[in-house]
Amino acid sequence: MALRRPMVAGNWKMNGSAQLALELFNKFATKLQDDSAEVVLCPPSIYLESVRQQLDANKDALNGCLVRMGAQNLSQHDFGAYTGEVSGQMLKDSGCRYVIIGHSERRRMYGETSDIVAEKFAAAQKHGLTPILCVGESGPAREARRTFEVIAEELDVVIEKNGTMAFDNAIIAYEPLWAVGTGKSATPEQAQEVHAFIRKRLSEVSPYIGENIRILYGGSVTPSNAADLFAQPDVDGGLIGGVSLNSTEFLSLCSIAMSA
């Protein structure tokens, strides 16, 4: 069985501040104990520099703890007249290691199709970034028992455009749309069922990828339900939304992941 290091990725969405970055690192420096889990902060692009400054300032205090920086989105284009967009190279220059791709809010609010998501996935890897690919079903799709069908379609488009081995440098986040920002989380059993399906799906085309890829759960993860979620055999941590804005609760999730 592969030893997959747990990850807790905080997606601030359009929230946060330079002060939040300071608060988080003040607690990381004294509370994070080891490198048994990886912590990723994904602030709005305007605060990437604030997070980077805190990473540099606390390098010694973190003492080898794995705290990384990620972005919430990127353009599928390398450069050009795309007002308001940020390229993969720009994110790499800013110190990012990860980037969230295909979040349900991007798909729903900004019309990002699976084809666009696949292009962004490729753009991230082209510039040395590890994509955190989000997949998940809506409430009606779950009620219609189409969960596996929807997720398979979202995965297959990325595989068709980028090849299976592209997932050798990628993270997957399962985020059921009916749980994102609603306060209603999937049960540990529901999460495990879908994570196991994703792993099996990838194993069919590459046993190595299926065994080794990290699959995060995203959807109203809190300190009260994280231990049961993270204890599932195919759940390798969480993509955290609202709780990532509370330094105390986010640190609690990091500690839970480290002991999972």
Curated annotation (Swiss-Prot):
It comes from the Bacteria. GO terms for cellular component: cytosol. Signal peptide: none annotated. Pfam families: TIM. It is found in: Cytoplasm. Substrate binds at N11, W12, K13, G181, S220, G241, G242. It catalyses: D-glyceraldehyde 3-phosphate = dihydroxyacetone phosphate. GO terms for biological process: gluconeogenesis; glyceraldehyde-3-phosphate biosynthetic process; glycerol catabolic process; glycolytic process. HAMAP family: TIM_B (MF_00147_B). Involved in the gluconeogenesis. Catalyzes stereospecifically the conversion of dihydroxyacetone phosphate (DHAP) to D-glyceraldehyde-3-phosphate (G3P). This is Triosephosphate isomerase. The gene is tpiA.
